[in-house]
Amino acid sequence: TQIAKFNIKLGESNMYMRKQYTEQNVYEAVQKRLKFIFEEFDNIFVSFSGGKDSGLLLNLTQDFQRKYYPNKKIGVFHQDFEAQYTVTTEYVDRTFKRIQNEVEPYWVCLPMATRTALSSYQMYWYPWDDTKKHLWVRSMPQYPYVINLEHNPMTTYHYRMYQEDLAKQFSRWYQISHGNKKTVCLLGIRADESLQRYSAILNKKYGYKDECWISKQFKDVWVASPIYDWSNSDIWHANYLFNYDYNRLY
């Protein structure tokens, strides 16, 4: 079934980036990319924020894995910022409960430095600050797969590290804890969300085997954006066609 008429292929011409439309639809394109990922990388995990894009990517990746690699487990990483919409937390909660026996689940609730615009006196806010438990916006989730200060296998974590560094160091720890083999983190970012996302995806210098949607983080650790050319309508079309669960906030 066609999800979109065209796949957007991003290429370089005369030192500038351009969009080139092809006859391949975005669903066919993401199947091809997932095949490439599963063939190229030993360790695969999805960064699942609880948003509509990462949720769609998680569902697509699981469908592909169940069909073609039934004996291979993927990881699912959720970075919990404590103060988030209740509907988002409910979606993350039911997703983890649904897939916990099929994947390696990692629900991370560690103190981290997050920039805040809500204070005139502090530059950073620290979700899950262990020194201010009485001020927590919500209670710590209580599941075996929750990573917090009392249960933290992440040897690359540093107390109150920047939120961006925490995500990167999770990738590094995932690689270390899985035999130091070639590892990729799948991100649900799309080029049409913003110029910043567009520029982030168009990697001219550190792409993997001429694929601009895969970028290097560390030695043998990569990040990939398999749905980079999907539109907002493609996301909802897929959710409808495949009857996927999604974050009702959207």
Residue ranges and their predicted role:
Residues 5-234:
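ATP-dependent adenylation/nucleotidyltransferase module used to activate substrates
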Residues 226-250:
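Mid-to-C-terminal catalytic subdomains of enzymes
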